[in-house]
Design a protein with these regions (language model features):
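N-terminal secretory signal peptides that target proteins for export/translocation
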Residues: 1-15
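Sequence-pattern detector for short linear motifs
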Residues: 11-12, 19, 211-212
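Sec-dependent signal peptide recognition
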Residues: 17-24
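C-terminal motif of bacterial Sec signal peptides marking the signal peptidase cleavage site
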Residues: 29-32
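Charged, low-complexity intrinsically disordered terminal segments
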Residues: 34-478
Length: 478
């Protein structure tokens, strides 16, 4: 296995870098290990479910009106109890409100996402709040920087949170220019502890991707500010093999979304909470929360997780979705190093007849994580889970669509780092039309993927098996 090198591309998808990884691993081992909560009760259906609560611009709907909304959605997809069971379970495991009246737009590739976000920035009149794991000093990052500085000069308040590790090789001059342009900057958990204004924890990273313009439109998903999203990943080709080097050069296949409506305020709260936790300054002024009217018919829940969380809502939501699915669960993830409870939930769903399909990348910018994920293939395939690896473009999307009505898009990978160590952000969407678009995108990715069968998988070479074994023991820190 080639050792990761300290280049911009080696941190493009996540935070793992050549020299930083062993330092962080040692630091973590010396300071103790967090663990995920026992969620066996979710998998066994033993959760004390609560009646769903739907929030609107006019307040909380009555139980009767809430049930009517859910019944109408269920009727569109036929016989499924994903709404009756999963929504009730999710209500019990998350404190985030389920908000009605939202317009959601699926952004299925890098260029369309960049164009949509740049267009939104140009319309900004009051404020721009941007939170990103990576912001590069390449042509894409410079274009964003130019526009942010231009809007600040026009009187727009601009606040930017970037992760210290994610921006490890972005030159300091890039941020100096933004600061000189009047932009408020927060470097999340600086690598240098002397720069930290609050509690220093190098192992905790801000992996969220969030843009909010004027408190009225939000963008979230898996897309960072990087040149790998500057060209389309949807051009199909004949080449079946790729390498880690391709991950540094090719376009990345990712998924983002645009949200308008009342739930934007919930995303705004998450941004402001991160700002407060990092700086100690509370920016929850009225300017960030304009009156919002209904823009569509999607129910959306904004789920934010942190390393010091108590409810593990994103993690529990994935387990709940798998445990309550009736027909299918279709997942994509860039990095796969799950705990055993997620694995068991996948296996149990497949064994009760649910069509569980997962698309992974066939090559990665982090070879260690690729092999760690593959070490779970045999166990999943034996249980009936269908596994695919996407060719050509580096798959970085973190999505799920369940039973044609429940979807999620966000920054959370199905790995221990996302569930335990990072600040992550996911949107959960209850909307049949949006789920149809999500499923169509999944099927398009499926056409550009190779299925991994149990028979073919067991014929892989000894060298690959050794790599899987070697990295599996490090799964907690990957």
């Amino acid at each position: 296995m080639n050792s990761p090198t300290l280049t911009r591309k080696s941190v493009a998808g996540d935070w793992h870098t050549g020299w930083l990884f062993p330092i962080v691993m040692l630091f973590t081992m010396l300071t103790g290990c967090a663990s995920l909560p026992d969620v066996d009760y979710l998998r066994r259906g033993q959760l004390q479910a609560q009646k769903p609560t739907i929030v609107t611009t006019n307040g909380t709907l009555s139980d009767g009106k809430t049930q009517s909304v859910l019944d109408r959605m269920a009727a569109k997809v036929g016989a499924t109890d994903i709404l009756a069971r999963h929504v009730a379970a999710e209500e019990a495991i998350s404190s985030a409100p389920l908000v009605a009246g939202n317009k959601v737009v699926l952004l299925d590739d890098g260029p369309i996402t960049m164009q949509a976000m740049m267009n939104a920035l140009r319309t900004a009149r009051d404020h721009i709040n941007l939170e990103t794991y990576i912001i590069e000093a390449d042509e894409v990052g410079r274009a964003f920087a130019d526009l942010l500085i231009q809007k600040r000069a026009a009187g727009v308040q601009v606040n930017l949170i970037y992760d210290s590790v994610g921006a490890l090789t972005t030159p300091p001059e890039f941020f100096d220019r933004l600061r000189a342009g009047g932009i408020n900057l927060v470097e999340y958990n600086p690598i240098n502890p002397l720069k930290a204004e609050r509690k220093w924890d190098i192992n905790q990273r801000d992996h969220r991707k969030l843009l909010i313009v004027d408190g009225r439109v939000a963008y979230t998903g898996g897309v960072n500010i990087s040149r790998v999203y500057g060209k389309s990943s949807l051009i199909r080709g004949k080449r079946n093999q790729a390498s880690p080097e391709d991950a540094k050069q090719s376009a990345w296949r990712d998924t983002h979304m645009q949200i308008e409506g009342p739930v934007v305020a919930e995303f705004q709260k998450l941004f402001l909470d991160t700002w407060r936790r990092q700086t100690g300054n509370d920016m929850s002024a009225k300017r960030y929360f304009p009156p919002l009217k209904p823009e569509g018919n999607a129910l959306v829940r904004a789920l934010g997780s942190t390393a010091d969380q108590e409810d593990y809502s994103v993690y529990k939501t994935y387990v709940s979705a798998l445990s309550n699915a009736s027909n299918y669960v279709h997942l994509t993830t860039a990095y796969f190093v799950p705990d055993q409870q997620i694995v068991e939930a996948m296996k149990e769903a497949a064994q009760r007849g649910v069509d569980v399909k997962i698309i992974f990348p066939s090559f990665s910018d982090h070879e260690m994580i690729l092999y760690a994920g593959r070490s779970f293939y045999d166990e999943l395939l034996q249980a009936g889970v269908k596994i695919y690896e996407r060719r050509i473009a580096m798959l970085h999307a973190k999505t799920a669509v369940v039973d044609g009505v429940w979807s999620t898009i966000g920054s959370t990978n199905l790995d221990m780092r996302s569930f335990l160590h990072n600040d992550e952000l996911n949107a959960v969407i209850l909307n049949v039309d949006f789920a149809e678009k999500m499923e169509a995108l999944f099927q398009r990715d499926l056409r550009d993927s190779d299925q991994i069968t149990l028979e073919s998988w067991r014929q892989r070479g000894v060298g690959q098996k050794m790599k899987e074994w070697a990295v599996r023991v490090l799964e907690y820190w990957l």
